[in-house]
Amino acid sequence: MPGLDGFGIRARLEEALLYLCTDARTERGDLAEFADAALDGGVDIIQLRDKSAGGAPLEARHELAALEVLAEACVRHGALLAVNDRADVAMAADADVLHLGQDDLPVELARRIVGDQVVVGRSTHDVVQADSAATEQGVDYFCTGPVWTTPTKPGREAAGLELVRHTAEHRGHGRPWFAIGGIGMDNIDEVVQAGARRVVVVRAITEAEDPRAAAAALRTKLG
């Protein structure tokens, strides 16, 4: 929630179970209503991730405008606002969370831009990356996956439930981590049984007819 200090953001992260990535919903024009519904249903963290089929991100001014809408919703619901990839945009948007992929800006350099108050997350796709992110200086949480193949990451091979099991067994009591990739109501039980307490979802909520109900159903599965 924009306005929290680093301690408050990290305390909220520890409690977070359900993390949502969404595009700006430009064609639908319902970003504010969608965000309110998803957050009301139980989403703890909402990240703007809007890329074209070719992988190009939104122009900065459009990204900041969408983030402003999400920030207002986060304030209303006590949720955390996340920015994907861009440390400069995270700083400009006063985001709570910056999420970095393996090929993005190094954590040390990102920290120079966003400072120590912002939570920084890492994407991991195999055991070596997950083990590294679990101890990497400057990282607050990490994601493991994709558990299953997903159109939001075309061409990326699924890591499967084995990565979830490994992380739960060897890194389950350290910094927070989330399973990600193709997770929905049809398979979330498998992810939980493999040891995940927290998940990241996309289509399970963004494509739902009732985002509030979809979020609530997923949240119930996580306890």
UniProtKB/Swiss-Prot annotation:
It holds the Pfam family TMP-TENI. Pathway: Cofactor biosynthesis; thiamine diphosphate biosynthesis; thiamine phosphate from 4-amino-2-methyl-5-diphosphomethylpyrimidine and 4-methyl-5-(2-phosphoethyl)-thiazole: step 1/1. It catalyses: 2-[(2R,5Z)-2-carboxy-4-methylthiazol-5(2H)-ylidene]ethyl phosphate + 4-amino-2-methyl-5-(diphosphooxymethyl)pyrimidine + 2 H(+) = thiamine phosphate + CO2 + diphosphate; 2-(2-carboxy-4-methylthiazol-5-yl)ethyl phosphate + 4-amino-2-methyl-5-(diphosphooxymethyl)pyrimidine + 2 H(+) = thiamine phosphate + CO2 + diphosphate; 4-methyl-5-(2-phosphooxyethyl)-thiazole + 4-amino-2-methyl-5-(diphosphooxymethyl)pyrimidine + H(+) = thiamine phosphate + diphosphate. GO terms for molecular function: magnesium ion binding; thiamine-phosphate diphosphorylase activity. Keywords: Magnesium, Metal-binding, Thiamine biosynthesis, Transferase. 2-[(2R,5Z)-2-carboxy-4-methylthiazol-5(2H)-ylidene]ethyl phosphate binds at residues 150-152, 182. InterPro entries: Aldolase_TIM (IPR013785), ThiamineP_synth_sf (IPR036206), ThiamineP_synth_TenI (IPR022998), TMP_synthase (IPR034291). Its EC number is 2.5.1.3. Its cofactor is Mg(2+). 4-amino-2-methyl-5-(diphosphooxymethyl)pyrimidine binds at residues 47-51, 84, 123, 153. One of its GO terms (cellular component) is cytoplasm. GO terms for biological process: thiamine biosynthetic process; thiamine diphosphate biosynthetic process. Condenses 4-methyl-5-(beta-hydroxyethyl)thiazole monophosphate (THZ-P) and 2-methyl-4-amino-5-hydroxymethyl pyrimidine pyrophosphate (HMP-PP) to form thiamine monophosphate (TMP). Belongs to the thiamine-phosphate synthase family. This is Thiamine-phosphate synthase. The gene is thiE.
